[in-house]
Amino acid sequence: MSNHEKMSTTDLMENLREELTCFICLDYFSSPVTTECGHSFCLMCLLKSWEEHNTPLSCPECWRTLGAPHFQANERLGRLANIGRQLRSQVLQSEDEQSICGRMPGPSWVFSDDEQSVINVSPPSQGTNKACFSSEAEEQHKEKLQDIINILRKKKKEVQAILNHEKERVMLCKEETKTCKQVVVSEYMKMHQFLKEEEQLQLQLLEREEKANMKKLRENEIQLTQQIRRLGKMIGRIESTCQNLTLESFEEVKGAMDRYESLLFQSPETTITELSLCHITGMREMLRKFSTDITLDPATANAYLLLSEDLKSVRYGGTRQQLPDNPERFDQSATVLGAQIFTCGRHYWEVEVGKKTEWEVGICKDSVNRKGNLPKPPGDLFSLIGLKIGDDYSLWVSSPLKGQHVREPVHKVGVFLDYDSGHIAFYNATDESLIYSFPPTPFHEALRPIFSPCLPNEGTNTDPLIICHI
């Protein structure tokens, strides 16, 4: 048999041994059993492994969690393991016999003095009578093999210890994950409770403001009704006097005029009602997750608008620029669109309006009409308009156009779009309050941000609109 054939036999035996070896004890199977995941182990090895590790039952090889200590005896695998053990023993014995003097052809070898190499001791002229290993060389050979075995056994113990440690870490990891889940659930329960309490406080505030507004409306209604009644009496008396006009009646009318003079100068007024903007705790932190980098699209900007180099701000310039009248450009409205086009997802951005007395920000269809200054059809534009006249400040949403008086100006506006759910909302980004939320509207085409710094209003509205970095 050639050296190549010997090596092939050794390799085959090693491969067979690996297939018939228990994963736990690394020896041939003894009374093997197979778990429900398909892996096989010695019966005693498997039971001992489950006993040593106080964890949910799992496969020692793939760590799959087992529903119950269920396994099947694998008698065929046991018989194969016995055959493999016997076959390996015979092959090793045969190789040992071939190494005995006179039976193995070729030269004989012994260890050199430094034990690092072997030397040929056969006389060149000898035929089949060869020198044998000396007993001293044989002992050295066995000692070296025993040293290797000891090293391998030590290494096996180290690997087994690491494996046992890793199995313990599996349970520890599960416990840590379970604890973290409990903490998350607990913290979110606290947050839910806190938000529920905040919700109740906001509702109570709105109810109080509603009562105050209703009281003002009723009081004004009573005053207007009384004024109408007094005016009616005055009209009736004057009409009666006109029908029977005498000197005495004229004097009576003159006296009545003096008495009702204050009534004539009373101007009827409508009641101003106010509602607080709905403060939402943690609103900005939640919306920041959907922040989108918005820039302006110069191709859509009205010729009177001046855009910054970084395309993050726009103001009214006062002088018409020489720009091409392309189809995308607004020719009458002081408007510019954002460069981003949305067809899905959630998006949030903020716009600094500062101390401007008039402005408009929002979202529109990409197909919105850019020519002329006609009102946009409902569904084409979703915008928020800020307007300050004297000391009165109001916010308007479009379209349809709805107004709301507010106590304080808004300096920074947050715009939120959830395309998939058809939701658009505006927020006061400074105090984290909701300004207005449009009813859900299904979107069927692309949407874009829209901005208008509006006209300068004799120099009182020259500040720019600035898209903020979130």
From Swiss-Prot:
Keywords: Coiled coil, Developmental protein, Metal-binding, Transferase, Ubl conjugation pathway, Zinc, Zinc-finger. It is an enzyme of class 2 (transferase). It catalyses: S-ubiquitinyl-[E2 ubiquitin-conjugating enzyme]-L-cysteine + [acceptor protein]-L-lysine = [E2 ubiquitin-conjugating enzyme]-L-cysteine + N(6)-ubiquitinyl-[acceptor protein]-L-lysine. Pathway: Protein modification; protein ubiquitination. PROSITE patterns: B302_SPRY, ZF_RING_1, ZF_RING_2. InterPro entries: B30.2/SPRY, B30.2/SPRY_sf, Butyrophylin_SPRY, ConA-like_dom_sf, PRY, SPRY_dom, TRIM/RBCC, Znf_RING. The keyword rRNA-binding does not apply. Residues 273-470 form the B30.2/SPRY domain. GO terms for molecular function: transferase activity; zinc ion binding. Its EC number is 2.3.2.27. Disulfide bonds: none annotated. A zinc finger (RING-type) spans 22-63. Testis. One of its GO terms (biological process) is protein ubiquitination. Residues 135-170, 196-235 form a coiled coil. PANTHER family: E3 UBIQUITIN-PROTEIN LIGASE TRIM. Interacts with USP5. Probable E3 ubiquitin-protein ligase which plays an important role in blastocyst development. Involved in progression of blastocyst stage and subsequent embryo development. This is Probable E3 ubiquitin-protein ligase TRIML1. The gene is Triml1.
